[in-house]
């Protein structure tokens, strides 16, 4: 859908659907007026890195123009903060105040690891400005760099393909597979849970995984992650290399954003795995549908 937005700016003839073109124009106008936030994330950096030449330049320019400095925090950082909140409550340990906004203008918000600030004799105000300029210049450079970067194929997806094919797993009930999906999600992030516990001074016990599993409903992003895994496993979906990026970033966005636009496949499994929550699933597959939802929220 970013390509639709980009084409609506740089080559309108490539947007064949009139409704898509109109929706793109409305969304861009709202974003530039500050009425809606359309953030950039590190997933966009990964996706644009596979492109090159004019196509990449146009797409990157569109992302930078519409996002206006807004970023979605790294899903890894979001779920670590969710786990900190749970552990702080369970062990009655006060957590240090932290910036919790998932969508932020803070320098380096979309990074998984905090940038190491170089030693400087600059006054605090100027040092802060320098840090912000460096952070946003980095986003610009990464997105606009015309060099094509080959995608790295991780083995994460094959683990779940193997689980789906396992006869013992296939014999389990749908309910048990959903439970297993959440358990696998907690297992995936357990090292992050350990880091969260250590940062709070909480003893790392064998029951850490059980504590996180029992409280998964109170962790929006991790809950979506677990429920999507369970849904796809019980439906024997084929796992592709890019699924990890989609589930991490779209799942995190779905947990916190008002409206999320995704490709049809991701929209389908996010909607079907949503289950009973306080609000309906915000994920849609078509840009006009997203604009319709936003229009209702803005009225």
Where do the PLM segments sit?
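Long, positively charged, glycine-interspersed low-complexity recognition regions
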Residues: 53, 219-299
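Metal-dependent nucleic-acid phosphoesterase active-site entry motif
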Residues: 1-19, 152-163, 169, 215-223
């Amino acid at each position: 859908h970013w390509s639709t937005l980009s084409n609506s700016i740089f080559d309108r003839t490539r947007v064949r659907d009139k409704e898509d073109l109109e929706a793109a124009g409305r969304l861009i106008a709202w974003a530039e007026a500050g009425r809606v936030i359309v953030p950039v994330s590190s997933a966009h950096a990964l996706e644009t890195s596979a492109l090159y030449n004019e196509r990449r330049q146009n797409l990157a320019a569109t992302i930078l123009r519409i996002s206006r400095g807004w970023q979605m925090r790294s899903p890894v950082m979001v779920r670590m903060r969710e786990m900190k909140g749970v552990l702080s409550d369970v062990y009655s340990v006060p957590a240090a105040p932290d910036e919790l906004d998932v969508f932020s203008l803070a320098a380096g918000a979309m990074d998984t690891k905090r940038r190491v600030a170089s030693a400087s004799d600059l006054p605090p105000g100027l040092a802060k400005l320098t840090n912000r300029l460096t952070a946003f210049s980095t986003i610009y450079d990464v997105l606009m760099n015309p060099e094509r970067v080959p995608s790295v194929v991780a083995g994460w997806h094959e683990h779940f393909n193997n689980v789906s094919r396992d006869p013992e797993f296939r014999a389990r009930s749908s309910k048990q597979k959903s439970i297993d999906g959440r358990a696998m999600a907690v297992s995936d992030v357990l090292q992050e849970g350990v880091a969260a516990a250590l940062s709070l001074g909480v003893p790392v016990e064998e029951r850490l995984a059980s504590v996180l599993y029992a409280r998964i409903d109170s962790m929006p992003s991790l809950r979506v992650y677990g429920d999507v895994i369970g849904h796809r496993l019980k439906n024997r979906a084929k796992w592709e290399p890019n699924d990890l990026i989609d589930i991490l970033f779209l799942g995190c966005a779905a947990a916190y954003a008002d409206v999320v636009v995704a490709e049809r496949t991701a929209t389908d499994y996010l909607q079907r795995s949503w289950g009973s929550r306080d609000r309906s699933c915000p994920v849609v597959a078509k840009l006009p549908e997203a604009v319709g939802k936003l229009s209702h929220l803005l009225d």
